[in-house]
Amino acid sequence: GIRALWNHIIDVSVSDLKKNYAALNVEFDLWKGESDVQDIIPGMVEKMKNDGYAHESEGALVVDVKEETDTKEVPPCMILKSDGASLYNTTDLATIVDRMEKYQPDKLIYMTDKRQDLYFEQVFRCARKTGLVKPETQLIHIGFGTMNGKDGKPFKTREGGVMRLENLIREINEEMYRKIAENREMEKEEAEETSKVVALSAVKYGDLSNQASKDYIFDIDRFTSFEGDTGPYILYTIVRIKSILKKYNEQSGGDN
C-alpha cells in the first residue's frame, strides 16, 4: 500500500544519504526524520490552543510571534494549514518538544541555508512563547551561504539541473584521477585510491576554507589544483615534509 511505498522511499533515501556522508567521512549518532515526531503534534497543537496561544487566521491555525522591538515584519508562525495539514514549522516545533523531553539540552543549534533566518526566528519565538523550552534554553540558528558555480549562480550540472552531492564527489574524483594519472607514474589502482583521498581534501577544504555565512564560488579546476590555497596542495606539502624528515632520519642514522 501507500505506507509500504512511503517506508521504501525513506529506506532508499536514508541509504543514499549514508553512502554520500560515508564518502565524506561524516557520521551521525542519530538519524531522525519528521515522521518520528508525528505522534507529538496533536497533543502539542491542542495545548497551544487550550493555553490561548494558537488561533485561527484565514482558516489556518497560527501563533503570533511579533514583538514591539521588531524593526521588520515577522509574520505569525503557522501551525496548521486551513485543511488541517501540518507544516515544517509544526514538525520542527514537535522536534523541539521531543529533544527537550529526551535530552534536556541547554542549547539547540540549527545549521541551514541562511535564507531560512526568518523561518527559524518564527519557530524559536513560537517555542519560547508557548513554553516548549525553558527560558534559559538557547535556540540558535547558524546560517551558511550557498555554493555557486563560476557564473555566481547556484552550482548546477552541465545540463542545468541541481548538482547532487554524489555527482559532485564523482566529478572531483575523476578530475583528481586525471591529474594524478597525467603527472605521476603509478599503477592504476594506486592512482584511483590516491585520487579519492586527495579529492576528499579538495571538497572539504574548498568548502571549509570559506567564511561559512558567505556565498562562494566552487571552481573544480581551482579546488583540485596542486598549487595555491587548496586541499591537494596542503596534502602535497605534508607528503613533502614527511619525505624530508624520512631522508633526514635515514642519513643521520635515526638519532633524531
Can you say where each PLM-predicted feature lies in the sequence?
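Extended, well-ordered alpha-helical scaffold/bundle regions in very large, multi-domain proteins
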Residues: 248-256
